[in-house]
């Protein structure tokens, strides 16, 4: 039957690859070719109508007139969206078939003269029969083809028009491009439906064959599972009859490993029971993999292997001194342990906790202790650990379970008595998964760690031979955990210690790391001191090492760029040329005695520093003002000092009503830096007395100590850092609380020798030493 012709149209043509669009179809298209994009723009500028025509060959990038089919679909552009990659996404709806009578290419895009194709009318009853037959056949096709959703059949049942039904069925069938194009070119609905039903019949036959093959495979799998089940039953019967075959080679290998591990009785019985269980399992089962993994861990853990511990004290002392300068308390504690160990055959390993700021050598000291004692070294980083299972392990009921990191590290190191470094123990935290700090209580208790129980191993493991060393930046550690460790504080290095560390360790390491030779770079002691004072502000030596590395890099650059330079010498005079402008400064003693100005001593996180305190008295009504970012404790210290002065006003020659007629202003310079603490109490009191009496304060005197309302001087902390700051700043005389005399044992001898240190008990002694003209006429002896 020939199709009926209708009106002629002139319309832009969009070539499509591997896609045939039917009437009533709504489909998104991604357009990337420039010519096609211009075609869409032309359609959008006109009536949003476009003709969609499939290419004969999808591989053709630039199709010509002869590369397109003659029949396509006139469509309406519903939406057009330009994408960031310069392509266009367009949503189109097919309207009606059309045949091209003339196709032209104007350079921008294809334009076609076409005419709509209309289908001849068919009898209504005949159409109903065709629709019903097609739907029934398509329903059978959907049942076999699981790729088409059942909702499609629901939508087909609502279609009464035979032509639209045929197009919808064709759109959902996996037809070749040529077959889809053939359906598009059939304007006769009767012919179109018959063609599609024939294609569906062919597809149904193929799908039925595929289903039979799938059923055969399924039966084969069921047969394999049945055979596996029967094999397991057979093994059980053989076990009852005592007719088990010889164990496979793998089981024999595991048995030999168990014998070689020399496990304690409990661990051996547990491991052998698991091995017997493994023999009864299929090697390919998931449970066998779990059991095999458990046995592997049990034979890897060191149950009896030990490394020989060094007992020669002189040799061990030499090792510690070679690796680290200073740190005498730690070295003495290690040597004490070695001394006792040389006399006692069985001694529990000490549990030390090295507490100190970053960069003072806590972690490297752990390595040095291991080297000195002859133990193997193993480190476990605890920073950020928040799961108890990291310590105790996971129970084997969990998929992918493993022992805790403690047992893993012991298996890795291979001996029972290593030095185990617990790094950053203060950085642990807890959450809903448990508290790892609480799990460590058992590990670090010498009375309990003889029977440490890992959840994965499920047997006791002896940790009493392990030498645990923990490191921490602060004392912010749970009290029960802290109670189990011997805390050794590592304060910041002194200037002399930093100089020696730089000369003996850091500089040579950086010279080697930067491929320099010893004679090519000479760094004078004055340059190293300059770096310590003016380019770093720390209690450790990390920044110092970075600055030395910077010197080495600049030296390498200079040597390579200027061949005439054979070696480089760096001293205090040319240090600025290599490291730039000085970043820091340190407090220095004032050169003149001043009224109302006192030099105090402060402790900071990076060491000690000089603290200047200024006071001024002006006519007023007794207002007390304090500035300089002072904390609450320091403000209260000023008020206490003022009360002490008022109580002694008559003896000091101060008018008794000064607090009513004068305003007093106390200022501590460097106002942007917060300051707090009670240790500036005697300095505040001295400054107030000097201001009110006009008696200057000696510029070469610095002081530290808390004051009470009765005028007593109370002890303070951080004495070592404060005295080092006084020594560095050129102070000659230092006043300290009498109760801090015991702390002078920790001060370097060269610092003690250069300072005139006076322990004081009362404010009267402080004023007698600090003021230019002693108000009481008394003398106070120094500690020398």
From Swiss-Prot:
Keyword Membrane: no
Binding residues for ATP: 356-363
Induction annotation: By heat shock.
Residues forming the catalytic site: 679, 722
Domain of life: Bacteria
Residue ranges constituting the Lon N-terminal domain according to the UniProt record: 11-204
Name assigned to this protein: Lon protease
Annotated organism of origin: Erwinia amylovora
